[in-house]
Amino acid sequence: MEKKTTKKATASKTTTTKKAAAEKTEIKETKKTTTTKTSTAKKATTASVEKTEVKETKKSSDNKKEFNPQDRPFAKYNRGYPNKQGRRKKFCKLCAKGQEHVDYKDVELLYKYLTPNLKIASRKITFACSKHQTRVSNAIKRARIVALIPFVRD
């Protein structure tokens, strides 16, 4: 009977030692993760400090070259457009004037909205809003009927 009790005692001792060993490994693993977290945090802070130092040195250096447009390969294409977006958006000239009604008798205005072949120019060319483009085109058609503007170039 003594052998049975010793086996049970050794079995219970081994289970307790296994549990203790498992707890120790868990503690070690948590320590490792916390140390790696702290070490990465330290590395990150040192890296951010280095970056700020580099930025400060870049700002403090006043050894800039003078701007020469010939140094750029496509400098001739950028002339006249100093901003990066390019051209400014066109707007309707009739809206800017505040002119609501387009008179068919105003031939000078109507010729501005015609092509050299006396066709009605598109909105892409005239930069007119849709409201004024339709009013101008109707006025041109009326002026053609009344013979103020010819239908075809002679």
Curated annotation (Swiss-Prot):
InterPro entries, per database record: Ribosomal_bS18, Ribosomal_bS18_sf
GO cellular component: cytosolic small ribosomal subunit
Regions of compositional bias (Low complexity) in chain numbering: 8-19, 33-49
Biological processes annotated in GO: translation
Highest taxon listed in the record's lineage: Bacteria
Molecular function GO labels: small ribosomal subunit rRNA binding; structural constituent of ribosome
Bias type Basic and acidic residues, positions: 20-32, 50-69
UniProt region (Disordered), positions on chain: 1-82
Keywords: Ribonucleoprotein, Ribosomal protein, RNA-binding, rRNA-binding
Pfam families: Ribosomal_S18 (PF01084)
Gene3D superfamilies attached to this UniProt entry: Ribosomal protein S18
Role: Binds as a heterodimer with protein bS6 to the central domain of the 16S rRNA, where it helps stabilize the platform of the 30S subunit.
Similarity field: Belongs to the bacterial ribosomal protein bS18 family.
Oligomeric form and interacting partners: Part of the 30S ribosomal subunit. Forms a tight heterodimer with protein bS6.
HAMAP family named in the record: Ribosomal_bS18
Name of the molecule in the record: Small ribosomal subunit protein bS18
Chain's gene name: rpsR
